[in-house]
Amino acid sequence: IDDVIRFAPASRQTLLFSATWPEAIAAISGRVQRDPLAIEIDSTDALPPIEQQFYETSSKGKIPLLQRLLSLHQPSSCVVFCNTKKDCQSVCDVLNEVGQSALSLHGDLEQRDRDQTLVRFANGSARVLVATDVAARGLDIKSLELVVNFELAWDPEVHVHRIGRTARAGNSGLAISFCAPEEAQRANI
């Protein structure tokens, strides 16, 4: 952002939009905007029609549960979120081994490969995209039927970003979260 601002004229209108407003975004706003007008929407007013389901399972039970849910729901498009690049690739590999068409999207991929993965997913070459949070930032898929949190997010705002990938453009969506005993504290259980 700073590189872009450096090339912008001194006299300009700068608009900044964010679904959440963590300290990092507030700091950017302070650097690039003068006397900004903040418009906040009450989070309950902004909620899209997302059905959330929660499944308690062991860590080893997550893959079989994911397979059962993909077979049950038969989504034409689904994003599965993992917390690490290693888990992301591992889940993708297992899904492909059992005949699910899956692609992985994480930070170890070159930008060219990430772009190619997104194009392949968008054109329906694969039904499942297994992704890390960072790689999926800004991901906008118009008709994403299902989001699965294979692992619970460390931060509640990340959870909101994840499930917000579904239920876009007036569509409803389904978000499923898995929780192993070691993740229970993050689920406020």
Show which residues each predicted segment covers.
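Conserved helicase RecA-like core
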Residues: I1-I189
